[in-house]
UniProtKB/Swiss-Prot annotation:
InterPro entries: ABC1_dom, Kinase-like_dom_sf, UbiB, UbiB_bact, UbiB_kinase
Gene Ontology molecular function: ATP binding; protein kinase activity
Binding positions (ATP): L129, A130, S131, A132, S133, I134, A135, Q136, V137, K152
Source organism per UniProt: Aeromonas salmonicida (strain A449)
Listed EC numbers: 2.7.-.-
Active site: D287
Membrane-topology descriptor: Multi-pass membrane protein
Function recorded in the entry: Is probably a protein kinase regulator of UbiI activity which is involved in aerobic coenzyme Q (ubiquinone) biosynthesis.
Boundaries of every Protein kinase domain copy: 123-501
Entry's localization field: Cell inner membrane
Name of the protein described by the UniProt record: Probable protein kinase UbiB
Pathway membership, UniProt: Cofactor biosynthesis; ubiquinone biosynthesis [regulation]
Keywords: ATP-binding, Cell inner membrane, Cell membrane, Kinase, Membrane, Nucleotide-binding, Transferase, Transmembrane, Transmembrane helix, Ubiquinone biosynthesis
Amino acid sequence: MTPKEFKRLYRIITILLEQGIDELVPARYQPWPGRLARRSLFWLKKKQPDLSRGARIRLAFEALGPIFIKFGQMLSTRRDLLPPDIAEELAMLQDRVPPFCGQAARLKIEESLGCPVETLFDDFDETPLASASIAQVHTGRLKENGREIVIKVIRPDIEPVIEADLRLMQTLARLVARFVPQSARLRPIEVVEEYRKTILDELNLMREAANAIQLRRNFTGSDALYVPEVFTEHCREHVLVMERIYGIPVSDIPALEANGTNMKLLAERGVEVFFTQVFRDSFFHADMHPGNIFVSYEHPDNPLWIGIDCGIVGTLNREDKRYLAENFLAFFNRDYRRVAELHVESGWVPPDTKVDEFEFAIRTVLEPIFEKPLSEISFGHVLLNLFNTARRFNMAVQPQLVLLQKTLLYVEGLGRQLYPQLDLWQTAKPYLENWMHEQVGPKAVWNAIKEKAPFWAEKLPELPELVYETLRQTRHQQRHFDQMFADFRRHSRRQGQARYLLGVGASLLLVGVFLLTQKQHIEWGQISLAGAGLCWLLGWFKARSH
């Protein structure tokens, strides 16, 4: 560890102790090295002892800086790991970072694009439109067509800072995992590694550009979601150029109402967008918090969502989608047996899981929830309770489902802020049932045939030759197998004879030794020993023969 890293580690420990984070672990569970280290830092006193544990954790993350703030934001979505009071506090973390100077942004853009800013853009504004811990956004116009754009640029020299903090976070996670056995349920090493992958992905803006292009293509012509156009010819690893949009932040409800927005339809559109992404496209925006969603000023009676910042996306394979849709339908029909069976069939829980016990555990957790009217039930919290129950039965971590549950909580929370009477189940059920019908009905079979038709048309001329070759190889393999079986039987017979001869030889040896001790039977003893030697010699030859 370098002196600079050691200084940073001391700073982290100081902040954690001043916020009393060490007291969150009961003394009886604290390992002796931890207690000793705490006593050795006796001059560090807790600053705000009256605050709740969630507030103290939030303040610690805020004091540790932007990388830890983003980590806290990520943790706030892992409600399968954290108590609700801590998760709610961490959700209040704001990525407030002073902008870096516009001249530095200009130099970074020119370094990435390999030419002066004025060559490509007009009206480049060095005053940032927005600033965050990883990047900041400037505005301008494309020189070739005059279109308004935003230019997102990664902060200069941010990578070494992130790498250093990540190394320290990994060190702390390993120490916690080693010395605090009760932390196993929180899986600190795994959580930090997940965060590491997420934040390193955010440093590559070409990935975000590709995600935005995919999402825009999926919703071309849609009246539910609009994704700004990306100008790929001007995008690089540290620079993203895309269309500038104008809209009302989705969380600004007074502005939406003043614009005459149909709030009920807007809330339902959010649900439609989410389930369309998941079940039609298998590709969903996984960071749909209010800061990334706007509503178009145009057509307030037919509101259009606008999505930005596609740095984090999720994907589902066909099997995940099928099991997920069946799970939704099963637990809203209170068919807990089917929910348990689906978890086993999907491989989300081990195959030796006792379905009866799993069903009982699910029923115990979900049945009280479903005593409420469906319109009052939180879809996201049902999923959360289901995953927490499954985790007790050794459910493997499913990153795609964690992202899905986080996004669903965002969408549901937004929907009910916009229209408190939103019945998420009634809005979502048609999408689920329609998707299931398309996957398992006659239409699905016909679509599968059509999808595979070109492949079989290409392979059809080769079919007779393939059949002949298969039959020839089968006949050859049968002859080879028969020969191997005959050789095996011969070998087994020889081995049996060898064991028999060795056994007889051992018996004759014992008899011979006994007779040699009797003076009147020495000749018979010699004959027995000779017989034993002969039997062993024959047995040895039999055993060596193949």
